[in-house]
Amino acid sequence: MNLELLESFGQNYPEEADGTLDCISMALTCTFNRWGTLLAVGCNDGRIVIWDFLTRGIAKIISAHIHPVCSLCWSRDGHKLVSASTDNIVSQWDVLSGDCDQRFRFPSPILKVQYHPRDQNKVLVCPMKSAPVMLTLSDSKHVVLPVDDDSDLNVVASFDRRGEYIYTGNAKGKILVLKTDSQDLVASFRVTTGTSNTTAIKSIEFARKGSCFLINTADRIIRVYDGREILTCGRDGEPEPMQKLQDLVNRTPWKKCCFSGDGEYIVAGSARQHALYIWEKSIGNLVKILHGTRGELLLDVAWHPVRPIIASISSGVVSIWAQNQVENWSAFAPDFKELDENVEYEERESEFDIEDEDKSEPEQTGADAAEDEEVDVTSVDPIAAFCSSDEELEDSKALLYLPIAPEVEDPEENPYGPPPDAVPSSLMDEGASSEKKRQSSADGSQPPKKKPKTTNIELQGVPNDEVHPLLGVKGDGKSKKKQAGRPKGSKGKEKDSPFKPKLYKGDRGLPLEGSTKGKVQAELSQSLAAGGAISELL
């Protein structure tokens, strides 16, 4: 697909719903890879579903966690995926094989995970009621980032666009800018409302292009800043936001905010309903409101990196928002000018003459001179939309798509070989011996997959009884986690996992698992003893 031909001449934001993506289980979070070709969706049963966004089909399913997936992030080259679940586990996955490379166990719930934009060996983790932690995957070490006050409980953090700095924000409205390599403080400022009142920082998001970033605060205002101005002001600066975005009518609180792929628009999802508000960053005016199904709550929003497409999650389903495709059946003249009606073409006297005797010899300029130039059809130029401003070439090892092979139930070993009768007896004996060797090797236990290394991360002064916000309030933590985890069969009220073998009783379709299994077996034995007839047993 040629992205240059997709350049829209009008508005560059979605206008209407363009279908849904059903992940079978309930979706909680989603994120695009760097090129927008793959969409990773974290589900309620711990699985990660990777969608091929061009075909809108499932390319891979990774059984990642036991508990719900709460945060996802792609590596820069697209080969790795880091995930966090509500049981305080952070894992790194190989996208092609689906294997887990590393696993980290934290003492408190994880609110966000993020790869370093340029170094996929570093991962930023935001634990609940703790300072942010930067993991180094190669040696499994971690560094706790400094905070403004030791009593800071809820601290959010994010890498800037190139990963040179880490921006952190606390519940008192204080923003710290730390150097990524040394964790030194280079700038700081406080977000205030009006005079001196402070407001809590809920999230920090950076644009893919440019130096702008936005801050979502508890006072229901989205503030847009220029990162260069923040660094210029230094410590305890007082920078003014470029824009302040809010819903003045309904005073809507914002669940998730992000920039468009080109950084010219900002989308914010309402925390009250399934509604997306889109603003133009340069002017600050509201250009579009996208309304989903009434009564649904929004969970996550992601904007496509290079196209005007938005993916939002509500009620466990991924909704896609795109532009309205208008078909054009107009007629075009040979010079590609659009015609409103059929026009009879009047040719010039000498237009189709091979040689014009009366024409003088002009100098070749413009299009005539370009006809004599050689056209390079072998070299491939990098696509500007996929390259950063400080890069010249694309990543040749990037993972854009997942290969899919057809599943054959009974493959023939040699469909194009000679028939069995034509094989000599000596070759048949050798084949039989090799077949025995193959069977013996198959009967033996296959080498198990390498178990991922699990590292326990110890954080000082962090309570161990915290419950993730996705699971509800603190208290009955066990029951909450059990309900939110991978579904288990219980009297047919909950869905069964499609990857679990099932045994059904008669036409009622009750899965024989756990305590229900014993109950159904007791009923069966009683009915057999009483001489009852069973119509069907699967």
Curated annotation (Swiss-Prot):
One of the record's GO cellular component terms: nucleolus
Location within or outside the cell: Nucleus
Residues joined by cross-link Glycyl lysine isopeptide (Lys-Gly) (interchain with G-Cter in SUMO2): 129
Start-end of Basic residues biased regions: 479-490
Repeat listed as a keyword: yes
Basic and acidic residues composition bias: residue spans: 491-510
Chief location: nucleus
Keyword line: Chromatin regulator, Isopeptide bond, Nucleus, Phosphoprotein, Repeat, Transcription, Transcription regulation, Ubl conjugation, WD repeat
UniProt key word Ribosomal protein: no
InterPro entries: RBBP5/Swd1, WD40/YVTN_repeat-like_dom_sf, WD40_rpt
GO biological processes: DNA damage response; response to estrogen; transcription initiation-coupled chromatin remodeling
Phosphothreonine modification, residue list: 252
Cysteine pairings via disulfide bonds: none
Subunit structure: Component of the SET1 complex, at least composed of the catalytic subunit (SETD1A or SETD1B), WDR5, WDR82, RBBP5, ASH2L/ASH2, CXXC1/CFP1, HCFC1 and DPY30. Core component of several methyltransferase-containing complexes including MLL1/MLL, MLL2/3 (also named ASCOM complex) and MLL4/WBP7.
Name of the protein: Retinoblastoma-binding protein 5
Biological source species: Mus musculus
Gene behind the chain: Rbbp5
